[in-house]
Design a protein with these regions (language model features):
Chain A
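Membrane-interfacial helix termini and adjacent extracytoplasmic/periplasmic loops
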Residues: 35-54, 114-159
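Transmembrane-helix boundary motif in ABC transporter permease subunits
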Residues: 70-101, 114, 132, 284-289
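Transmembrane alpha-helices
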Residues: 100-103, 107, 111, 165-169, ...
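Interhelical loop and adjacent transmembrane-helix boundary motif
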Residues: 225-274
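Transmembrane alpha-helical segments of polytopic membrane transport and secretion proteins
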Residues: 1-12, 284-294
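Alpha-helical transmembrane segments in multi-pass membrane proteins
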Residues: 61-66, 70, 74, 82, ...
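Periplasmic/extracellular loop-to-transmembrane helix junction in inner-membrane transport proteins
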Residues: 1-6, 28-70, 90-91, 143, ...
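N-terminal signal-anchor transmembrane alpha helix
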Residues: 11-28
Length: 294, 394, 277
């Protein structure tokens, strides 16, 4: 083995050791809280650091409801926006528009959070809540709000993850061979029908990978969420209520934890979050791998 | 390959680019860090102090996070901070527990402040209330703004027939402690049911009219946004938030609004304060006598360990505490906190002089205090309290 | 002719697509606009040359955060550039079969870590030993940056045409020399672009810094001292009740956006010049 190969092998092994150390220490530090509460920790509904009672469900719920609703919005908007860029916009503008969409991804999340505090929170409080008050019998839209809410978190999350899935779908749509589309046009299909019958099925896997990746981003997003979600560990159906997510509570409470069990609980939440992201990202990779072959 | 690397000019350039700054950054003098946590009551003043203190003492970094008095006391009890802030003096049981583990904890009054009762009634600018009426509002006995008892205190004011939204702190709060201490003084029923406490639940009679906010800032925000609400916040937050304040009937029978002057009056009646090495759990200056005294006033304290582990931190703490008791006080009034009367400052300074270092030990790292027992706990070893785990064995 | 259902659905979808695009673009424009409009107020010399000053005055600037960001990013690059480069090199040139697959999976795992968790790791490894420090923050950001550097290096080296490699071999040059000088030389611009993009990526990260560098007002001179950073100071000031600090937060956000934009556009321009993009 030549010197360069051994040097790079050395670094690679070092990296492997670091990552394994990382995962091992996280699991180790989360053991105490699992020892005390058992597997019930994951579905525990009460989180009260002052009484040393910890349960993960409020955060699992918050992460789940915000990410899921955000990705649903993202899927709908992405398809439309990608369709627009590829099929409707003049070809010369295409590159520019894609760059603009990708620009959103580059905005640091704390800046989106800053914008969220001063614009989205008042939007939810002064516009969306009054607008939806005739519908407030629906549990999802009930209750008063200060603006800091699951809904505000959903809005910023949607904004942050939609460009990701849009890029993927756009790239996939662009790679559909022109001959196939032209054949469909020649048979008299409308632009939408070409999309529905030709492009969509062919790009299904790539689009799915992009969507899953975007979902993974939503699950792990910390700053923008912690600045607008209200940081209250309760499980409520109403989106106007404040909530909490796994990433947000770790960021907020880690420095102020005053008992060993508290830190263990927070790290345990980190393990849950980590596993969740891992599963999501692995899924995306598996799907993408199939795309390359297929 | 090595020979090539040594001869190549670009390689040397890169090496210098990376290592020179690194060497500079590792060898530069290290700052001493003081970490504190606790009350949001004095937070704006402490922030201002830190800025000016930093300009004067460049090698001491002070960090303070407003997490609420309850969190501050908890931090002191688990030794994860160098000092804590609390509006409420430590409970006797808490103080004795800390005394056993770490030695005496000093209460050093850093400033004083008033708790303003704030309200949001669009139709009304000025409101008078008495202590027992206020207590009954918080007990849920008085439900509407035009209740006869409120009306009788405010002749000629057109109070609307609206439900009263009652706001309290969601977190464990010294501001709540001061407020409930006052309510306990003026309402026998409050004293016997809820008493003075950092956190309480709304009585059932409040029903759905109860709202909660985090920190003084949270409560201020709610009052700003919800009409017909009433709440309590530290005075500076009321002014900054543009909130209307209640004129409260004081012990002498006058209706007094909170202001620098009326709040500062209460300090005159802080006649005897305990020795720093004793518990301060009985200290209270609410409902003080005096024609022009605002009734809901308190000192806010810095809690600090008498026995320090590290000589450097001990010296830095002394410098910081001395500064805020002397030069720091000049910034108080501009931020709407009355400056401390000289006799109180003297008491504080004498306590600061008594800070001393445990001989021998280099110093604990408080983060170690949490992670190390965590490591032990994760492999099944019983975790012991922090003071024992690091200090005494060395 | 009566419009058919098919052409109606086509028109409807077109309208929907335009609508969806607008829903995406309009908030983006609003964000950019509000950053500019709110941030321009305090985008002055004082912002970048002064540490925080009295709340009763202008509030000072964020010099402490700028220096802190420089220190933290420097450490992050110190950790991630060599590590990421050599791992990417190994994957592109030397690795085979199962080990390569394992290594790539590990890189993907690392890439998917939520940034706050990288912060927790840095806390348990660095903060516990050295205290809250720029070193800890740099370590966390370094962990986050490694996959970006590794992937872009691997991709860059993979784009080297076989003819160039073969030409080197045919001249009798040893393997490692071919890789180091010819392959890396060919892909140099792309590799450097990868470095810069990783830098742009971590310069805006906040979550890991929250729990590793402590965020005080001091101007750090030593990596073992606590520090502040531009994204962190934006967070702190945004959450404070002081209007003066809100203004500074917007200006700091504008500054950060400008830095990130300059790096991103600079990289694109650089690649265009090298006739690659």
């Amino acid at each position: 083995m030549d010197p360069l190969e051994s040097l790079s092998l050395f670094f690679s092994v070092m990296l492997i050791i670091v990552v394994l150390l990382f995962m091992g220490s996280m699991v180790l530090y989360s053991l105490p809280v699992f020892e005390k509460f058992g597997i019930k920790f994951i579905v525990g509904t009460e989180w009260n650091p002052r009484k040393d009672i910890f349960g993960a469900l409020p955060f699992v719920w918050g992460t789940f409801i915000t990410s899921t609703i955000a990705i649903v919005f993202a899927i709908v908007i992405s398809y439309g926006a990608a369709y627009f860029i590829v099929e409707i916009a003049p070809p010369k503008l295409r590159e520019f528009l894609s760059s603009v969409i990708e620009l959103i991804v580059a905005i640091p999340s704390v800046i989106i959070g800053l914008w969220g505090i001063f614009y989205v929170v008042p939007l939810v409080r002064d516009f969306l809540k009054p607008l939806s008050s005739p519908l407030s019998f629906i549990p999802f839209l009930s209750g008063e709000t200060s603006g800091y809410s699951l809904m505000a978190a959903i809005i910023v999350l949607t904004l942050m993850i939609t460009p990701i899935s849009t890029s993927f779908i756009k790239n996939a749509l662009e790679s559909v061979p022109m001959e196939l589309k032209e054949a469909a046009y020649a048979l008299g299909a409308t632009r939408y029908e070409v999309f529905k019958i030709v492009s969509k099925p062919l790009t299904r896997r790539a689009a799915l990978a992009g969507i899953i990746l975007a979902y993974g981003r939503a699950v792990g997003e910390t700053m923008a969420v912690v600045m607008v979600v209200g940081n209250t560990p309760n499980i409520s159906l109403s989106l106007f209520n404040p909530g909490y997510t796994l990433a947000a509570v770790i960021a907020n409470e880690f420095l102020e934890a005053t008992s060993v069990l508290h830190i263990s609980a927070l790290i345990a939440l980190g393990v849950i979050l980590f596993v969740w992201s891992l599963v999501v990202n692995t899924l995306a990779i598996l799907i993408m791998k199939r795309v390359r072959i297929g | 390959m090595l020979r090539f690397m040594l001869k190549n000019r670009k390689f040397w350039l890169l090496l210098i680019l990376f290592t020179v700054p690194l060497i500079l950054m590792v060898s530069a003098p290290q700052a001493i860090t003081l970490v504190g946590q606790g009350a949001t009551f004095p937070e704006p003043l402490i922030m201002e102090w830190i800025i000016h203190f930093q300009e004067r003492y460049r090698n001491i970094t002070v960090i303070y996070k407003g997490t609420g008095s309850g969190a501050g006391v908890k931090a002191i009890l688990s030794r994860t901070v160098d000092f804590a802030g609390s509006d409420a003096p430590m409970k006797l049981s808490e103080w004795e527990e800390a005394n056993r583990k770490f030695g005496p904890i000093f209460h050093i009054p850093e400033t004083m402040g008033g708790v303003a009762v704030v309200f949001n009634i669009p139709e009304v600018e000025e409101l008078n209330l008495s202590g027992d009426v206020l207590a009954d509002i918080y007990l849920g006995r008085i439900e509407y703004w035009d209740d006869p008892r409120i009306v009788s205190l405010n002749p000629g004011v057109g109070l609307p027939h609206e439900r009263i939204y009652v706001v309290k702190r969601a977190d464990s709060s010294g501001t709540t402690y001061i407020f409930t201490d006052y309510l306990s003084h003026v309402s026998a029923e409050w004293a016997s049911t809820i008493g003075k406490t950092k956190t309480f639940s709304f009585p059932d009679a409040i029903g759905d009219r109860g709202l909660t906010g985090y920190g003084n800032a949270g409560v201020a925000q709610i009052i700003q946004q919800i009409p017909y609400s009433i709440g309590y916040v530290e005075f500076a937050y009321a002014v900054k938030g543009g909130l209307k304040t209640v004129a409260l009937r004081n012990k002498a029978g006058n209706f007094v609004k909170p202001s620098l002057e009326t709040i500062a009056e209460a300090a005159k009646y802080a006649l005897s304060l305990p020795d720093p090495e004793e518990s301060w759990h009985n200290v209270s200056i609410v409902n003080s006598p005096g024609e022009n005294t605002y009734p809901i006033v308190s000192f806010t304290y810095i809690l600090v360990y008498k026995y320090q582990d590290s000589p450097k931190i001990c010296a830095a703490l002394k410098t910081w505490l001395r500064w805020i008791l002397t030069e720091g006080q000049q910034y108080s009034e501009r931020l709407l906190y009355p400056s401390l009367p000289q006799n109180i400052v003297e008491i504080g300074l004498s306590a600061v002089e008594r800070l001393q270092t445990n001989t021998g030990s280099e110093g604990y790292k408080f983060q170690l205090c949490l992670i190390f027992p965590l490591l032990l706990a994760s492999i099944g070893i019983e975790n012991r309290s922090c003071g024992e785990c690091i200090g005494e064995d060395n | 002719m009566r419009p058919s259902l098919r052409s109606l659905t086509d028109k409807f979808y077109t309208a929907f697509a335009i609508f969806a695009f607008l829903i995406l673009i309009i908030p983006l424009l609003h964000i950019i606009l509000s950053i500019i409009m709110n941030g321009i107020k305090r985008l002055d010399l004082e912002l970048i040359t002064s540490p925080p000053k009295s709340l009763l005055g202008s509030g000072g600037g964020i010099l402490h955060a700028i220096i802190g960001t420089a220190m933290v990013v420097f450490i992050a690059m110190l950790i991630s550039l060599p590590l990421g480069f050599f791992v990417g090199l190994y994957l592109a040139e030397f690795a085979k079969g199962k080990f390569a697959h394992f290594l790539r999976t590990l890189i993907s795992v690392l890439a998917g870590i939520p940034s706050i968790i990288a912060g927790v790791f840095a806390y348990t490894v660095i903060v516990v030993v050295y205290g809250f420090s720029a070193l800890a923050g740099g370590f966390a950001l370094g962990i986050i940056a490694i996959p970006y550097v590794a992937r872009s290096t691997e991709e860059a080296l993979g784009s080297v045409p076989m003819e160039i490699k073969e030409a080197g071999f045919s001249l009798g040059i040893e393997r490692w020399k071919v890789v180091l000088f010819i392959d890396v030389g060919y892909a140099k611009s792309r590799i450097i672009a990868g470095f810069l993009l990783a830098l742009a990526r971590v310069i805006g990260e906040t979550a890991p810094l929250l729990i590793t560098i402590l965020g005080g007002i001091n101007i750090p001179s030593n990596i073992f001292s606590p520090a502040n950073a531009i994204p962190l100071v934006i967070y702190q000031y945004a959450l404070s009740p002081f209007r003066i600090w809100h203004n500074i937060a917007w200006s700091a956000a504008l500054l950060l956006m400008i830095i990130v934009l300059v790096i991103n556009l600079g990289v694109r321009y650089y690649l265009k010049i090298k006739a690659i993009y």
